[in-house]
């Protein structure tokens, strides 16, 4: 009897200790040691330190006996703040005090079963259910777990990054996993973090608690594990206490297979641990129920459009499609709450069923959580640190570990390498290499076996994967397996090796453990020898590529990347030697020929799908192949580069580009600047972290670009728009610019996070590189210190720069003195753009000193938005009378006013003024300014273009201007009068002007109230053979059908005439 009591106590105590997390178990041991340090039965710390739950229970009972061990454990549970275990233990003690005569017919059955039998009749139904949920969700099996192996969910689970989701459905990518792209949004600016604990709490947007929460996330991002953790934490009393009395978990994949009708009662019974559930208690307060519907995207199409009446009460039996729809649509018990998980591909279908749900997106692991995951996966802290540091230093691997599933794959692969005694190698740097390493690790030989053990009929597996991919099918029935030569024995082998998963509760249906693995095997199907792929689709790789067309939205995107990666020589060797698969020898040549034909059809320009194309080339990791593939393109434009990984992929490929003449790399970081609108990526399936603006790119990125400058003698233009190079990146890039082989002529570094200190390296590059003639540094924090450094290079006799753009570079008046000295010493500089800098009148006065210098050869000067006033125009006027080289001057968006323009006209009228283009848009001009400009048009024979847009000139101003336009000496060819307050009366003057002026060819009148009368008058003049006008823009006017007909007729009689309306 004593032995029975001991077994009983050991069973009960070890069960309770098993529920403690690792930290809690350590605290339990410390508190226990404190409580017993004065007693004779004290347990030595050396015995407790490494003891697990079972060993700890044995130590307690050995030293104190069953009763005292149980008492000590309960008091310690209370001290470590696990009151749920203390309260449950107290209740069990009450039941155990049942008087003699209780059930004794169990005989020699397990005392643990006797305990349950004794407790059940008097146990609270909610506690019974909580116990069941704990048992069901406490343990989880890894995908490669052997029989009986499991992991405590609480010990492995790592908190996921959740944000409130407000993105448009068009921004959601249709594919389920694409490790080559990250989440294309700036998390800190476009989404609000949220915790699981507050999912059903009100916030500023909704004062009432939401009844439905949708958690979306790409495949492998951790939706199901999170749903399981919610169930477990509720059962443990850590979550939603006081909010929900019961949580029920519904697996949509299992619901797919239900062929019989069922009711809500039946659904509850299927979740309940006992034959009957307390339905009346549940119905009584439905608002305290939460149903977790896991995997909405996996439901069959019939679930989205069910036929028949809704299920409106608990007892009604309906097909599972109708039952689940009634539950989701809140036709059945609208008071209850729902937590629905889904992939982005099903969001639109789900939206149609719900009313005002809260949307939450699972973004995966942050950097800190990735580290935490590694330390939880590897129990050895030293080993965990070694692996994490390796992965952190390996950019592609570390980026992919943002996705929990991929994080697990990487950990599994690297653990296999460590256990094999090998060093951590660089073979895991691509997506394909990671998946191949995972596959090989699953096929490691058993002890004593001579070689890897591949699955039987592996080619049939690849054929099944490809067939499912083309038909967009992820669940397979028995007949699908038979079609590809796979029988039950094959499936059993795949399950054992964790390549092919058989659903525990859906035995008739099978699936790959993850869509990405199906795509991996589908790619292998295409590299097998012809006829070796089973009953799958056509193995013509060109059909695959044509359908894919390097589109990130294509359902073939990841498969195509895997295809390139599998053709890597080392990977191919693994396939042939380790798995005995024969790879088709002509696939590489087929790929190169297809790329060549695509280049020819696109005019040797790579733009559409360029980033996806680079991702494919990155996977193959073969220098010669990449060089051949890129040799057919002369112009390469890569847009929307949103992550460090994408920058790395791009620079990796461009380093191996030997033929391109023009390279443009556009980053995708959001900007509030209207001029630089964000080019945001539309995909939500993407799974990499977008680069924050405050972060600079890795050195390797700039090193690769510098290498491209050294090795590609054809490269003459490089544009790096919104690439966060930073000072270190610029230094590395300039090493390439200074290389003798560099022939670059045009360098654009607009908004590349360049500080003033980096200008020293740029200055040295200007001196060393005599080919460089154009440079754009706009949108960088150059400032006065940077300008000083930059001008040292610009003043050097060897500098050959002809154009420099310094828009919005935080320059002030002091910078103009430096630039003036450049204008006085550098005869090569002909274009200068200082737009968007607060130069003010003082700065312009200093700049004019350089403009008046005899050495100055400047032809084009942009001074838009420079805080200039009328006072600056006097200085400009005197400069225009002296400078013989200036041809274009832009003063738009400065408050010059009529007085300023009248002063400017004095210089414009001077006989030596050679200005041809003058822009005065949005300069607060009125009709008075037109009088002075009219005189200029008569006196200045060089002026060809005049922009007066967005000034309140009015009809009187145009009348004054027309006097100059009608003068025989006027040579103006283009005139902008957009939004100048003109009416139909102005058209009378224009009518006569166009009849006289023989040089004006372009007239822009957008957003003026000319009306039908005014426009028809213009049409009358335009129809005259003597009218020389070729461009007339009339956008923004409300014209009737008759006027539009007149314009259409005019287009017919004068097809060369560009009429915009």
Swiss-Prot record:
Keywords noted in UniProt: ATP-binding, Cytoplasm, Leucine-rich repeat, Nucleotide-binding, Repeat
Location of the NACHT domain: 211-528
Organism lineage string: Eukaryota, Metazoa, Chordata, Craniata, Vertebrata
Protein name as it appears in the record: NACHT, LRR and PYD domains-containing protein 12
Annotated organism of origin: Homo sapiens (Human)
Quaternary state and interactors: Interacts (via pyrin domain) with ASC. Interacts (via pyrin domain) with FAF1 (via UBA domain). Interacts with MAP3K14; this interaction promotes proteasomal degradation of MAP3K14. Interacts with NOD2; this interaction promotes degradation of NOD2 through the ubiquitin-proteasome pathway. Interacts with HSPA1A and HSPA8. Interacts with HSP90AA1. Interacts with TRIM25; this interaction inhibits RIGI-mediated signaling pathway.
Domain FISNA span(s) in chain numbering: 129-201
Gene Ontology molecular function, alphabetical: ATP binding; cysteine-type endopeptidase activator activity; protein-macromolecule adaptor activity
Induction field: By nitric oxide and DMSO in HL-60 cells, an acute myeloid leukemia cell line.
């Amino acid at each position: 009897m004593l032995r029975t009591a001991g077994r009983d106590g050991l069973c009960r105590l070890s069960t309770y200790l098993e529920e403690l997390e690792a930290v809690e178990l350590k605290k339990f041991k410390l508190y226990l040691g404190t409580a017993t340090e004065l007693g004779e039965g004290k347990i030595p710390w050396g015995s407790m330190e490494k003891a697990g739950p079972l060993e700890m229970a044995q130590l307690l009972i050995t030293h104190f006996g069953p009763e005292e061990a149980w008492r000590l454990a309960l008091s310690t549970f209370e001290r470590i703040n696990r009151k749920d275990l203390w309260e449950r233990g107290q209740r069990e003690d009450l039941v155990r005090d049942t008087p003699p005569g209780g059930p004794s017919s169990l005989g020699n059955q397990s005392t643990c079963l006797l305990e349950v039998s004794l407790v059940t009749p008097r146990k609270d139904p909610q506690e019974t259910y909580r116990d069941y949920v704990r048992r069901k969700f406490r343990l989880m099996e890894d995908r490669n777990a052997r029989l009986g192996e499991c992991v405590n969910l609480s010990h492995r689970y790592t908190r996921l990054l959740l944000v409130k989701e407000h993105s448009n459905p068009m921004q959601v990518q249709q594919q389920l996993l694409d490790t080559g792209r990250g989440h294309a949004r700036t998390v800190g600016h476009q989404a609000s973090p949220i915790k699981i604990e507050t999912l059903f709490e009100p916030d500023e947007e909704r004062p009432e608690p939401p009844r439905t929460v949708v958690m979306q996330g790409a495949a492998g991002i951790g939706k199901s594990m999170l749903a399981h953790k919610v169930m477990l934490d509720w059962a443990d009393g850590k979550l939603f206490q006081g909010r929900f009395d019961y949580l029920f978990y519904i697996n949509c994949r299992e619901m797919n297979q239900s062929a019989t009708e069922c009711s809500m009662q039946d659904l509850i019974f299927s979740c309940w641990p006992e034959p009957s559930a307390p339905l009346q208690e549940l119905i009584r307060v439905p608002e305290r129920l939460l149903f977790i519907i896991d995997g909405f995207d996996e439901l069959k199409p019939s679930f989205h459009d069910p036929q028949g009446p809704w299920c409106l009460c608990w007892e009604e039996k309906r097909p599972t499609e109708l039952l689940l729809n009634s539950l989701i649509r809140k036709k059945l018990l609208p008071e209850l709450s729902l937590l629905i998980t889904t992939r982005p591909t099903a969001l639109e279908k789900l939206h149609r069923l719900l009313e005002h749900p809260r949307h939450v997106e699972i973004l995966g692991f942050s950097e800190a959580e990735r580290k935490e995951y590694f330390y939880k996966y590897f129990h050895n802290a030293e080993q965990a640190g070694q692996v994490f540091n390796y992965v952190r230093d390996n950019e592609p691997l570390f980026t992919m570990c943002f996705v929990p599933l991929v994080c697990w794959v990487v950990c599994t692969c690297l653990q296999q390498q460590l256990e094999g005694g090998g060093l951590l190698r660089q073979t895991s740097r691509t997506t394909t290499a990671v998946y191949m390493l995972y596959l090989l690790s699953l096929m490691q030989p058993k002890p004593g076996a001579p070689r890897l053990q591949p699955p039987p009929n592996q080619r049939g597996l690849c054929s099944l994967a490809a067939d499912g991919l083309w038909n967009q099918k992820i669940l397979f029935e028995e007949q699908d397996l038979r079609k590809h030569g796979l029988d039950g024995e094959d499936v059993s082998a795949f399950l054992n090796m964790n390549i092919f998963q058989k659903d525990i509760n859906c035995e008739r249906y099978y699936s790959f453990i993850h869509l990405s693995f199906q795509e991996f095997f589908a790619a292998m199907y295409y590299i097998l020898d012809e006829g070796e792929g089973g009953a799958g689709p056509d193995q013509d790789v060109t059909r695959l590529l044509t359908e894919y067309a390097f589109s990130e939205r294509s359902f073939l995107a990841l498969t195509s990347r895997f295809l390139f990666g599998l053709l890597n020589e080392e990977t191919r060797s693994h396939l042939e030697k380790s798995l005995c698969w024969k790879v088709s020898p002509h696939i590489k040549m087929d790929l190169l020929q297809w790329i060549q034909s695509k280049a020819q059809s696109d005019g040797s320009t790579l733009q559409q799908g360029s980033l996806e194309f680079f991702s494919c080339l990155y996977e193959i990791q073969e220098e010669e192949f990449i060089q051949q593939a890129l040799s057919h393109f002369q112009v390469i434009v890569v847009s929307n580069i949103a992550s460090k990984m994408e920058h790395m992929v791009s620079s990796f490929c461009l380093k191996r580009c030997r033929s391109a003449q023009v390279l443009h790399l556009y980053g995708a970081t959001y900007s509030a600047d209207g001029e630089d609108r964000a080019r945001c990526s539309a995909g939500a399936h993407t799974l990499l972290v977008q680069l924050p603006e405050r972060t600079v790119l890795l050195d390797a990125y700039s090193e690769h670009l510098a290498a491209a400058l050294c090795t590609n003698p054809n490269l003459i233009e490089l544009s790096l728009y919104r690439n966060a190079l930073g000072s270190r990146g610029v230094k590395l890039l300039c090493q390439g610019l200074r290389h003798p082989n560099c022939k670059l002529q045009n360098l654009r570094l607009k908004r590349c996070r360049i500080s003033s200190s980096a200008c020293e390296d740029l200055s040295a590059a200007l001196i060393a590189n005599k080919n460089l003639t154009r440079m754009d540094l706009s949108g960088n924090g150059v400032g006065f210190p940077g300008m000083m450094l930059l001008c040292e290079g610009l003043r050097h006799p060897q500098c050959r720069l002809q154009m420099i753009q310094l828009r919005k570079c935080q320059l002030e008046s002091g910078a103009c003195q430096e630039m003036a000295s450049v204008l006085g010493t550098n005869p090569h500089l002909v274009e200068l753009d200082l737009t968007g800098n607060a130069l003010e009148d003082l700065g312009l006065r200093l700049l004019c000193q350089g403009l008046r210098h005899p050495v100055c050869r400047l032809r084009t000067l942009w001074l838009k938005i420079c805080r200039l006033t009328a006072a600056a125009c006097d200085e400009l006027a005197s400069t225009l009378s002296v400078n013989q080289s200036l041809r274009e001057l832009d003063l738009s968006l400065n408050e010059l006013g009529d007085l300023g323009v009248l002063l400017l006209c004095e210089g414009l009228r001077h006989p030596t003024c050679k200005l041809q283009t003058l822009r005065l848009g949005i300069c607060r001009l009125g009709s008075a300014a037109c009088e002075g400009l009219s005189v200029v048009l008569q006196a200045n024979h060089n002026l060809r273009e005049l922009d007066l847009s967005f000034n309140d000139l009015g009809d009187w101003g145009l009348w004054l201007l027309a006097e100059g336009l009608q003068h025989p000496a006027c040579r103006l060819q283009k005139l902008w009068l957009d939004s100048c307050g003109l009416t139909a009366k102005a058209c009378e003057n224009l009518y006569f002007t166009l009849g006289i002026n023989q040089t004006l060819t372009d007239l822009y009148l957008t957003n003026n109230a000319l009306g039908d009368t005014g426009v028809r008058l213009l049409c009358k003049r335009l129809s005259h053979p003597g009218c020389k006008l070729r461009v007339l823009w009339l956008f923004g006017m409300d014209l009737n059908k008759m006027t539009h007909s007149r314009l259409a007729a005019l287009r017919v009689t004068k097809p060369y005439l560009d009429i915009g309306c």
